[in-house]
Structures are given as C-alpha cells and as structure tokens.
Curated annotation (Swiss-Prot):
The gene is AZS22-16. The keyword Repeat applies. Belongs to the zein family. The alpha zeins of 19 kDa and 22 kDa account for 70% of the total zein fraction. They are encoded by a large multigene family. It comes from the Eukaryota. It comes from Zea mays (Maize). Keywords: Repeat, Seed storage protein, Signal, Storage protein. Zeins are major seed storage proteins. Expressed in developing endosperm. The keyword Kinase does not apply. This is 22 kDa alpha-zein 16. GO terms for molecular function: nutrient reservoir activity. Residues 1-21 form the signal peptide. Pfam families: Zein.
C-alpha cells in the first residue's frame, strides 16, 4: 500500500508541474533590431508621467543646490585674496619713500627692513624681531660654547638679569670678557695688529675711533696697573690712531686675523 501511495503522489506531482510549465517559443528569439521599435512610445509616455517629471525636477534642484555653495566659496576666497593683496600694496606704498632713503644710506638695514613684511613676528613686535636677528648672529658661538662647556652655557642664559632683559648685549659682553686675555697678549706683542683686529668688528670703532680708544682704555686700566707693558700699549694707541683710520678705508692694509682659533 505504501508503495502505491508514493507512486500516486509522484504522478500527481508530475501532472502539476506539467500544467504549470510553459515553453518559450522560438519566435521570441527575434533580432534585437526589432525591439527598439516599441521603446520610443513607452519612453515618451514615461517621461510625461507627473511622478517622473517631479523626480527629474527634484534631481535638478539638488544638483544646483550642491553646486551653488562651491561657487560661493570660490568667490569668497578670491575676494579675500584680492583684499589682502590691496592691503599689502597700500602698506608698501606708505613705506616706499623712507625705504628708498634708507636703501641709499644703509643698504644692509634696508634689506633687513624688506624682510619685516614677510615675518609675522616682525609685524607683531619689531623689537622682538630685531632681537631675534641679533641672537642669530651669536648662535654659532653659543653652539660651540654649549658643546665645550654646557654648564657655562646654561649659566650665561639663566643667571644674569641682563641676559633676560637684553640677551644680545649680555652675550657680547661675555664674549669680550672671554677674549680679553688673548687680546691683551696680542696688544703687548703687536699693538698695530691688535688695533687692526678690533676696529673692523666694532661698530663704535668704525663710527668714532676716539671714543672707541677711550672705551678700551677704561677696560684695560686695571691691567695697566698690574702690568706696565699695558700702560705703554695704551699710549701707543693714541699714536696709531691715524693709521687705524686709514686702514679702515683701505681693506688691503688690514692684516688677517691672528689667533683665529681663539675667536
């Protein structure tokens, strides 16, 4: 009985599948060239439908809304750059007369002033900018001092009120104190060479040689008391003053640095 029931169920399943099945006719395999004949009317009807038109309008509005902020940002950035350029040109025109006069009188200072406009620190605080430029001149010497004796280097930067208030002046004073012994030996051995070594590197000596010699006498007076040779050297400085001024005007007469390793 069970076998017969299973056979009947299998026959019923075959009959049901046969009634639901369909056969694809070969005429459906028509060439693709004949299909587009029926598409244009359907496509035009679809575009004329209100729902499709509303969807297309929504897409167009979204595209225009996305493009509008980008164009506005580009216009704002161009306007901002234009305003910055105009402001910079106006500032340069204000300083052109004084800068032209400065270029004739002192070209080095003129070049330094030209860099002020391109430096944010110079625009905010000119004094701090100039102090930074002076510190950069002493950086090689400070680097050597930090490598040779770090303790002295740290002491120079932290232990003196002058170092905190005016670091370039303090560093210059400390460097002069370090080279005074070597300069004293050079002054005793060859006073003319000593003066030639100091004059080109001292602004006071270039502008006013008499005041410079007076300053050097005040510095070396304690040494003159202890060493008569130094007192004799100080007297020779006054005699060599015309020669030193002439050597400043003629670089060919300036001797090379003696004992350059000391500096």
């Amino acid at each position: 009985m069970a076998t017969k029931i299973l056979a009947l169920l299998a026959l019923l399943a075959l009959l049901v599948s046969a009634t639901n099945a369909f056969i694809i006719p070969q005429c459906s395999l028509a060439p693709s060239a004949s299909i587009p004949q029926f598409l244009p009317p359907v496509t035009s009807m679809g575009f004329e439908h209100p729902a499709v038109q509303a969807y297309r309008l929504q897409l167009a509005l979204a595209a225009s809304a996305l493009q509008q902020p980008i164009a506005q940002l580009q216009q704002q950035s161009l306007a901002h750059l234009t305003l910055q350029t105009i402001a910079t040109q106006q500032q340069q025109q204000q300083f052109l007369p004084s800068l032209s006069h400065l270029a004739v009188v002192n070209p080095v200072t003129y070049l330094q002033q030209q860099l002020l406009a391109s430096n944010p620190l110079a625009l905010a605080n000119v004094a701090a900018y100039q102090q930074q430029q002076q510190l950069q001149q002493f950086m090689p010497v400070l680097s050597q001092l930090a490598m040779v004796n770090p303790a002295v280097y740290l002491q120079l930067l932290s232990s003196s009120p002058l170092a905190v208030g005016n670091a370039p002046t303090y560093l210059q004073q400390q460097l002069l104190q370090q080279i005074v012994p070597a300069l004293t030996q050079l002054a005793v051995a060859n006073p003319a060479a000593y003066l030639q070594q100091l004059l080109p590197f001292n602004q006071l000596a270039v502008s006013n040689s008499a005041a410079y010699l007076q300053q050097r006498q005040q510095l070396l007076n304690p040494l003159a008391v202890a060493n008569p040779l130094v007192a004799t050297f100080l007297q020779q400085q006054q005699q060599l003053l015309p020669y030193n001024q002439f050597s400043l005007m003629n670089p060919a007469l300036q001797q090379p640095i003696v004992g350059g390793a000391i500096f």
